[in-house]
């Protein structure tokens, strides 16, 4: 089994049932629905297609809804002579960004961020379209921010605006994000990704909305702002996982800092047993090519060897020409990296060692010493499985739960295959639990009689999450 997981962005190239099925068959573990594009109706169709494809293929695939976040964008531009809503900026010219609602031209554009004049000062850099166009603020007057074009280039409607080094006064969740979050909860999403997280407290409003809606969903923090890197450890502790969003990170931070920042994100996420996704241009050239560059193949493999739980595609599968080929290529690279470079994955240091963490770590040691065929964890929230997974054991991990959303959440956990039950297991005696475990794994073809397995669970009758306190070394078939 491939150990590291694959997250794929769904878009026009793959949103049909056939398109999504091709990604699932190629190896997709988590489907990303990007709420920066499309309507709720569009994404509902994608969600339904995803569930249908997973059912038809018999694979566990999670639905991740990625909230747009407080992204600053240009407004609309007037159409040019070619009928395109695009302008060409030239070096040295003056260009104005205004909070007034106007149609833009080569001299001025509106912006979605009404607080821009209050946050900008003379000398501040402003980047458009991921830094392809660079401006420098010359003055601020009323609703207008006056700039000089430093790096020229084309600008079109709704291109992103970044203010590197500027602490912008934006909320963690916009009105659109709150509406999209409620939609995701009601639709049945398994994972939420929050964009432009800056502080650990950014998760608070999301939790308030979830409580109002009656269901908590794991929230992954996208690390892309300098403030997020400054507050990284507290963010990792507060959120359920993180995504290293290297695109905006490379615009907001000096480019040369991104590789080491990525490694630090992976290390901290593993330390606190939180799944970590490495994203942005992992196999970027495959948007237009059936093969990646050598550098991209190395980037993908090195993310896994650094200890990431998953790598992610963006444009490659959303609008690319070879989406299924991209996923199968990523799967091959990932599989080879873990099969032949397993001992290169760093050992963990300074573990966050709760009682559950200590039990999980002991289970990994036992499985290794006994050459066990499996580590089995019964779980309600997925926490125990993540604590086993962070140690990157060579032994296969099987998470067993009767919670459907936890079942899908475990699709993101390194080295883990999960089983969904339709019955409760908390009140089973030790013997009954072992017989029950044998049947699940034998029916799935994972073990045979005589194999040793290590089983993690809570005490009989214990229903509280986070109470894993028992390790059983069991020989399959011994309790029959």
What are these model-derived regions, one by one?
Residues 1-480:
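Non-catalytic helical/linker scaffolds that mediate oligomerization, partner binding
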């Amino acid at each position: 089994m491939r150990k590291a997981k694959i997250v794929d962005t769904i878009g026009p190239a793959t949103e049909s049932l056939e398109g999504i099925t091709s990604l699932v068959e190629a190896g997709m573990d988590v489907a990303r629905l990007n709420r920066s594009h499309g309507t709720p109706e569009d994404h509902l169709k994608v969600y339904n297609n995803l569930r249908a494809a997973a059912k038809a293929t018999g694979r566990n695939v999670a639905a991740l809804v990625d909230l747009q976040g407080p992204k600053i964008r240009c407004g609309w531009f007037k159409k040019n002579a070619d009928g395109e809503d695009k302008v060409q900026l030239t070096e040295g010219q003056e260009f104005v960004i205004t909070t007034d609602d106007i149609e833009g031209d080569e001299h001025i554009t509106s912006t979605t961020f009404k607080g821009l004049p209050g946050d900008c000062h003379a000398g501040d850099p402003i980047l458009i379209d991921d830094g392809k166009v660079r401006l420098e603020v010359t003055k601020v007057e009323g609703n207008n921010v006056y700039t000089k074009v430093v790096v020229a280039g084309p600008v079109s409607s709704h291109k992103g605006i970044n203010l590197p080094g500027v602490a912008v006064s934006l909320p963690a969740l916009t009105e659109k994000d709150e509406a999209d979050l409620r939609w995701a909860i009601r639709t049945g999403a398994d994972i939420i990704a929050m964009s432009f997280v800056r502080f650990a407290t950014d998760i608070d409003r999301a939790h308030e909305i979830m409580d109002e809606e009656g269901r908590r969903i794991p929230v992954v923090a996208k690390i892309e702002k300098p403030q997020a890197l400054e507050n990284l450890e507290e963010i990792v502790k507060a959120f359920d996982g993180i995504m290293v969003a290297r695109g905006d990170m490379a615009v907001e931070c000096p480019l040369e800092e991104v590789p080491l920042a990525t490694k630090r994100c992976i290390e901290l996420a593993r330390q606190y047993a939180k799944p970590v996704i490495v994203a942005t241009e992992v196999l970027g050239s495959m948007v237009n090519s059936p093969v990646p560059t050598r550098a991209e193949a190395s980037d993908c493999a090195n993310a896994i060897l650094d200890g990431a739980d998953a790598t992610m595609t963006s444009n490659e599968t959303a609008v690319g020409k070879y989406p299924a080929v991209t996923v199968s290529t990523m799967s091959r690279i990932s599989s080879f990296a873990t099969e032949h470079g397993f001992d290169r994955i760093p050992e963990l240091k300074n573990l966050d060692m709760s009682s559950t963490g200590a039990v999980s770590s002991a289970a990994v040691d036992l499985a290794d010493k006994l050459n066990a065929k499996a580590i089995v964890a019964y779980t309600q929230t997925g926490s125990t499985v993540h604590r086993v997974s962070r140690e990157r054991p060579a032994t296969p991990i099987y998470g067993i739960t009767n919670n459907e959303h936890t079942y899908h959440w475990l699709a993101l956990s390194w080295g883990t295959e999960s089983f969904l039950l339709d019955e409760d297991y908390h009140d089973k005696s030790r013997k009954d639990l072992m017989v029950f475990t044998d049947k699940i794994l034998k029916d799935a073809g994972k073990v045979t009689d005589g194999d040793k397995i290590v089983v993690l669970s809570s005490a009989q009758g214990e229903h509280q999450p986070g109470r894993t306190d028992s390790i059983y070394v069991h020989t399959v078939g011994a309790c029959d």
